[in-house]
Amino acid sequence: MAHTVKIYDTCIGCTQCVRACPTDVLEMVPWDGCRANQIASAPRTEDCVGCKRCESACPTDFLSIRVYLGAETTRSMGLGY
């Protein structure tokens, strides 16, 4: 089941989302846009289970990482509009 994982440029490179992910979807990659010189990346979105632990772990007020659940998941959860 494919979910979309978006990482925004408000990421501070803290690695909290990477550590929170139970399926190792995320990893840190070099990036000059923040003090930590790294940003989260989601190279393995096919393994995402949609638990949103990465979102919960994000310490920024902007939720620098967002998981958008696939259509099949939202339908089975009764979230389809």
Swiss-Prot record:
Q: Which gene encodes it?
A: psaC
Q: Which one of the record's GO molecular function terms can you name? A: electron transfer activity
Name the UniProt record assigns to this protein: Photosystem I iron-sulfur center
Cofactor(s) recorded for this entry are: [4Fe-4S] cluster
4Fe-4S ferredoxin-type domain boundaries = 2-31, 39-68
Q: What does this chain do?
A: Apoprotein for the two 4Fe-4S centers FA and FB of photosystem I (PSI); essential for photochemical activity. FB is the terminal electron acceptor of PSI, donating electrons to ferredoxin. The C-terminus interacts with PsaA/B/D and helps assemble the protein into the PSI complex. Required for binding of PsaD and PsaE to PSI. PSI is a cytochrome c6-ferredoxin oxidoreductase, converting photonic excitation into a charge separation, which transfers an electron from the donor P700 chlorophyll pair to the spectroscopically characterized acceptors A0, A1, FX, FA and FB in turn.
Its EC number is 1.97.1.12
Q: Which subcellular locations apply to this protein?
A: Plastid, Cyanelle thylakoid membrane
What keywords sit in the KW lines? 4Fe-4S, Cyanelle, Electron transport, Iron, Iron-sulfur, Membrane, Metal-binding, Oxidoreductase, Photosynthesis, Photosystem I, Plastid, Repeat, Thylakoid, Transport
